[in-house]
Amino acid sequence: MEPGRRGAAALLALLCVACALRAGRAQYERYSFRSFPRDELMPLESAYRHALDKYSGEHWAESVGYLEISLRLHRLLRDSEAFCHRNCSAAPQPEPAAGLASYPELRLFGGLLRRAHCLKRCKQGLPAFRQSQPSREVLADFQRREPYKFLQFAYFKANNLPKAIAAAHTFLLKHPDDEMMKRNMAYYKSLPGAEDYIKDLETKSYESLFIRAVRAYNGENWRTSITDMELALPDFFKAFYECLAACEGSREIKDFKDFYLSIADHYVEVLECKIQCEENLTPVIGGYPVEKFVATMYHYLQFAYYKLNDLKNAAPCAVSYLLFDQNDKVMQQNLVYYQYHRDTWGLSDEHFQPRPEAVQFFNVTTLQKELYDFAKENIMDDDEGEVVEYVDDLLELEETS
């Protein structure tokens, strides 16, 4: 949007519209994973491409309609992936056949085949997988919130300023340095009542809970802060593991490679998606992402529990925090304090163990990063190293190494 191209009369008209318009229906209001509207079921990529075609032709209402549908279809696909992977992960694994203990490779691939069978059966029953699957480029657009860039301008041209403001804000949270959108938002903020419509259309419930918990914390309402923060933690972990599951969706295989290299390439691509989940799910508050979000939640919790003299809950939160920031001097001192008063407060060794969900999250993210770094250094195509042409050269390299 280029505000400089409009005259004073147009600006006056827009100000009147801003006063008169109410916030419209959110694009996810009709969304339901269990009962998605049949009239909206279509391939995600087709809906998105059609929306962009209508956008290019300046058919704003149709563009808005199909952009909103494509956002719902994308959420349906992600939720469907997460649903199947979550259920198949929880499915009990049969005991290996007698004698297989000596064949770890067969056991490994046996588990993979059973998992594939479970996923195939699950996906056959879900409407999201009865459509042709989108390309990785389209999925990347949705991950980057690109549809909101187009929605913002289409809403504006359709005289729906409340939604245009929300779409601009939603896009800016992922692209805080986008100059055009920053200018658009500056213009919107100059309109009366604009602040009422500045909202993240992709916000997660744990973000609202976290903000409420911090506000209660700052107001020294310790119990309220603890209640909301203890709700935010599992809600974030749920979103995180669903994000991991969604990364295991369909992939386009183009290269012709050896069996193990092909599997490794596929898994590295999945890992690349998974290691971005934590960053992508981190709340952005005041234009800045919350640094070390999971650790920060444990930091707030340990102090709030301490203020209520509940050291049996404060100590595990302190130890959990130190998983993510081992060199934090303040938290180390807190832990020394808790250890010193352990008899007074009836603390045992189990109170100085990190919470199980923190250990699981730490282990998963750490191992994923280690695997990805190994693959990046040793397997990925950018780092193929020296090409060996003859067996003698290979033997010589092995001897020198």
Swiss-Prot record:
InterPro entries in alphabetical order: Collagen_mod_leprecan, Leprecan_dom, TPR-like_helical_dom_sf
Major subcellular site: secreted
Gene Ontology biological process: chaperone-mediated protein folding; collagen fibril organization; negative regulation of post-translational protein modification; protein stabilization; spermatogenesis
Signal recorded as keyword: yes
GO cellular component, one term: endoplasmic reticulum
Localization annotation: Secreted, Extracellular space, Extracellular matrix
Cysteine pairings via disulfide bonds: none
First and last residue of the signal peptide: 1-26
Keywords: Disease variant, Dwarfism, Extracellular matrix, Glycoprotein, Hydroxylation, Osteogenesis imperfecta, Secreted, Signal
Outcome after substituting K157E: In OI7; severe form
Tissue expression remark: Found in articular chondrocytes. Expressed in a variety of tissues.
Transmembrane segments: none
Glycosylation sites: N87, N363
Database matches in PANTHER family: CARTILAGE-ASSOCIATED PROTEIN (PTHR13986:SF3), PROTEIN LYSINE HYDROXYLATION COMPLEX COMPONENT (PTHR13986)
Known role: Necessary for efficient 3-hydroxylation of fibrillar collagen prolyl residues.
Record: disease: Osteogenesis imperfecta 7: A form of osteogenesis imperfecta, a disorder of bone formation characterized by low bone mass, bone fragility and susceptibility to fractures after minimal trauma. Disease severity ranges from very mild forms without fractures to intrauterine fractures and perinatal lethality. Extraskeletal manifestations, which affect a variable number of patients, are dentinogenesis imperfecta, hearing loss, and blue sclerae. OI7 is an autosomal recessive, severe form.
Family classification: Belongs to the leprecan family.
Protein's UniProt name: Cartilage-associated protein
Gene source species: Homo sapiens
Top-level taxonomy: Eukaryota, Metazoa, Chordata, Craniata, Vertebrata
Gene field: CRTAP
